[in-house]
């Protein structure tokens, strides 16, 4: 999109890709974290470049977070469905323009997957943070990657790689008890090479103010 604007012959200002990771620590308010991410990711159907592209969840609270997402109307893709959506996210190595800003149910239909019409977000549970994993890319739609982290250091490492994949300087997000976990927060903000570090807040709204 930015390249197209720059080549249009008219003045344009553009920014880089986001690929925002959101970490959910085991001290986080899970209801707040999940509701915030849904609020952010469904705003404008995920077109805001600061919106969460991946959720990294500590193992201790992974199942609770997954249940909360499901209870809120998000759809967890099974392995076969995940593979189908993978093939729809990218076309020839680039983001598929047909999914940008579309509803979750529309993207599912494009992928040959059937979901309830009111589905808020499609969530693929994946492991790789490498660019070979389509879910590890910026998706600009109500599609999320969800990763399990064995501990906070593993979560930080995964987030760092996702940021590097998308390009440094954009946005990172974390949910935790900011009073008792100050050391984790300090390390997070020092390790994430992003201009915005958001704490316990929806990243779309945090990014655009």
What residue ranges belong to the model's regions?
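Short, hydrophobic/aliphatic alpha-helical segments
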Residues: 2-5, 204-206
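ALDH superfamily catalytic-core signature
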Residues: 3-130
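Conserved C-terminal structural/oligomerization subdomain of aldehyde/semialdehyde dehydrogenase
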Residues: 113-209
């Amino acid at each position: 999109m930015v390249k197209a604007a720059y080549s249009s012959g008219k003045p344009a200002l553009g920014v880089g890709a986001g690929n925002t990771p959101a970490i959910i620590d085991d001290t986080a308010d899970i209801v707040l974290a999940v509701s915030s991410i849904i609020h952010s990711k469904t705003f404008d159907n995920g077109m805001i470049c600061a919106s969460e592209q991946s959720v990294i969840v500590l193992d201790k609270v992974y199942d609770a977070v997954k249940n909360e997402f499901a209870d809120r109307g998000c759809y967890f893709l099974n392995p076969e469905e995940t593979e189908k959506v993978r093939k729809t996210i990218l076309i020839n190595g680039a983001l598929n323009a047909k999914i940008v800003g579309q509803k979750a149910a529309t993207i599912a239909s494009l992928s040959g997957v059937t979901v309830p019409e009111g589905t808020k977000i499609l969530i693929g549970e994946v492991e790789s943070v490498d660019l070979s994993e389509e879910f590890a890319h910026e998706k600009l739609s109500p599609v999320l990657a969800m990763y399990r982290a064995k501990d906070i250091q593993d979560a930080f490492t995964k987030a760092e790689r996702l940021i590097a994949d998308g390009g440094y300087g954009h946005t990172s997000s974390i949910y935790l008890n900011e009073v008792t976990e100050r050391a984790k927060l300090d390390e997070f903000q020092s390790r994430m090479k992003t201009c915005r570090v958001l704490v316990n807040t929806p990243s779309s709204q945090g990014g655009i103010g």
